[in-house]
Curated annotation (Swiss-Prot):
GO biological process: proton motive force-driven ATP synthesis
Keyword Ion transport (UniProt): yes
Protein's recorded name: ATP synthase subunit delta
Compartment(s) where it occurs, according to its Swiss-Prot or TrEMBL record: Cell inner membrane
UniProt record similarity statement: Belongs to the ATPase delta chain family.
Chief localization: membrane
Assembly and interaction partners: F-type ATPases have 2 components, F(1) - the catalytic core - and F(0) - the membrane proton channel. F(1) has five subunits: alpha(3), beta(3), gamma(1), delta(1), epsilon(1). F(0) has three main subunits: a(1), b(2) and c(10-14). The alpha and beta chains form an alternating ring which encloses part of the gamma chain. F(1) is attached to F(0) by a central stalk formed by the gamma and epsilon chains, while a peripheral stalk is formed by the delta and b chains.
Amino acid sequence: MVKLPSLKFLRRSTDETPNVSETASHSTVLDVGAEKLGKTYARALLAATQADGSTDAVVSDLNAICDEALLHNPKLQLAFQSPQIDADEKCRVVDRLFGGNSHPTLIKLMKVMAKRGRLGYLVAVRDAAVDLFDEAAGRVVAEVRTAVPMTEQLRGEVTQQLSSRFGKTVRLRESVDTELIGGMVIRVGDTVFDSSVASRLDKLGKSAAAGFARQLIEQSDRFSSSS
């Protein structure tokens, strides 16, 4: 686990402080460009870790940085994203905060990204790295969007049905989208199972938690596929 040191050293005098007005966000810009960029760096990272068998450790460290350090420190994410902070300063930040806790291969990649103005895409790299890691291990990643958080029962049902459908171990990546009119949207690779119409839940009634996922998967021929 990455223990985040104090950020006091980032505090500069008024004249030295960059004029940064953007709002930090844990999620990297969700566009095709960011996704492709994330995959490019993720492939390079995993290739570099295969030789010494450090993939598990590197992915774990990358998850810790994204889910602990960046998520809970908007100021740090702003620093990574801002074009007004030069690459050398970002590299110093990486060294001071993570150099003693994270794998050297990951630190090297982060510095390369900083020098190329790409450090703000670190979360996209993490997402792609985890997906590639799961794929190599024979796991399938299913992105599940629901109008409300899933119950344990529904989570288990979705996992079971998807595992049966694809013949592989499934890991869910869950998100809540309050704009969905009930139901859920499941994406596995290029395949999308969409049942986000409230009337479906009304028909299912109290059996929704136990049977919704099964009906969704079994009737997948009615749902759309997108690339």
